[in-house]
């Protein structure tokens, strides 16, 4: 077997392992969320299927798989089917450039940050397609909310990272992690971290920024007409987005795989898991603001913070050069 073929097979195997790990982490997070919410709300949570309810996730998957794959007769069939596929794959493709360890990652791109912002932006199309193709007023209103919120906060998401790019001089995520060997970016880039955290919650439509779904207002928003595995793709895609944002926070601000004693993979996984639990804690503890308050917070608070962070970082770098 030639070296090139061996290398190709290794890369394919590596990509498959990362794919299974991401989907598994996103699916398992849904179970952990239900257990933690039950703990914090003083109730039992899922505890009937398997020991400690561990097989509840498998039961839910079987249920979704065997539910009727119904498409409304008034829907645009092709776009209706395409929407959940885009929602599921966009965040997975974005994960391709995230370095898990010094030697483990699917791709090492010099423009890794730009790639993530571009690919993650495809999720907006999934929301718009779902809302428009469903031909339902609540679905359309939810998709319009989601697209406005996502497009707005993706601006802040990108601007919050420009301070890191100015500081490290690279869009490569591996270079950014290596630059944090002595000091994590969360210290000099604290404003960038805060705005990235807010924007990450908003882009993934998580509580308290879950305005596109707002059950009390929009009857579950843009995926109201979806059922079975199509709804399951939206559901798992949301949790994969949380895994992606958590891993990016760790990679960009908390040193990635760097840490004492433990192997690099365990440090990366432990830090990522901590932020995934933090996302769940936000859902359990915060109320949902109005949609106009969410948009005002982005443009009146997050945008100025990102610009201030860029100016401070540029000034510090310029002073160090001189």
Swiss-Prot record:
Keywords: Cell inner membrane, Cell membrane, Membrane, NAD, Quinone, Translocase, Transmembrane, Transmembrane helix, Ubiquinone
Gene Ontology MF terms: oxidoreductase activity, acting on NAD(P)H, quinone or similar compound as acceptor; quinone binding
GO cellular component: plasma membrane; respiratory chain complex I
Catalysed reactions listed for this entry: a quinone + NADH + 5 H(+)(in) = a quinol + NAD(+) + 4 H(+)(out)
Quaternary organization: NDH-1 is composed of 13 different subunits. Subunits NuoA, H, J, K, L, M, N constitute the membrane sector of the complex.
PANTHER family: NADH DEHYDROGENASE SUBUNIT 1, NADH-UBIQUINONE OXIDOREDUCTASE CHAIN 1
NCBIfam families listed in its UniProt record: PRK06076.1-1 (NF004740), PRK06076.1-2 (NF004741)
UniProt name for this protein: NADH-quinone oxidoreductase subunit H
Naturally occurring in which organism (per UniProt): Shewanella oneidensis (strain ATCC 700550 / JCM 31522 / CIP 106686 / LMG 19005 / NCIMB 14063 / MR-1)
Gene it is expressed from: nuoH
């Amino acid at each position: 077997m030639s070296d090139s073929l061996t290398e190709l097979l290794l890369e394919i195997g590596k990509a498959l392992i990362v794919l299974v790990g991401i989907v598994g982490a996103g699916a398992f997070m849904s179970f952990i969320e239900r257990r933690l919410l039950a703990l914090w709300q003083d109730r039992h949570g899922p505890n009937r299927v398997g020991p400690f309810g561990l097989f509840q996730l498998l039961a839910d998957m079987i249920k979704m798989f065997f539910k009727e794959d119904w498409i409304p007769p008034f829907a645009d069939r092709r776009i209706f089917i395409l929407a959940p596929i885009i929602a599921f794959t966009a965040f997975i493709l974005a994960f391709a450039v995230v370095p898990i360890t010094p030697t483990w990652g699917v791709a090492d791109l010099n423009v890794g940050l730009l790639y993530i912002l571009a690919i993650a932006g495809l999720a907006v199309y999934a929301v718009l397609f779902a809302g428009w193709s469903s031909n339902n007023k609540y679905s359309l209103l939810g998709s319009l909310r989601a697209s406005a919120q996502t497009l707005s906060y993706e601006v802040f998401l990108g601007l919050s990272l420009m301070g890191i790019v100015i500081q490290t001089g690279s869009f490569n995520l591996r270079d950014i992690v290596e630059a944090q060997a002595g000091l994590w970016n969360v210290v000099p880039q604290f404003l960038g971290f805060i705005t990235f955290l807010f924007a990450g919650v908003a882009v993934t439509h998580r509580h308290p920024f879950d305005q596109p779904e707002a059950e009390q207002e929009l009857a579950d928003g843009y995926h109201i007409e979806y059922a079975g595995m199509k709804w399951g793709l939206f559901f798992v895609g949301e949790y994969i987005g949380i895994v992606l944002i958590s891993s990016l926070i760790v990679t960009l601000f908390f040193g990635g795989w760097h840490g004492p004693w433990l192997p690099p993979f365990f440090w990366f996984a432990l830090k990522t898991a901590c932020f995934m639990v933090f996302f769940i804690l936000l859902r359990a503890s915060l109320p949902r603001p109005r949609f106009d308050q969410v948009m005002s917070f982005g443009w009146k608070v997050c945008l100025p913070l990102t610009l201030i962070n860029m100016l401070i970082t540029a000034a510090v770098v310029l002073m160090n050069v001189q």
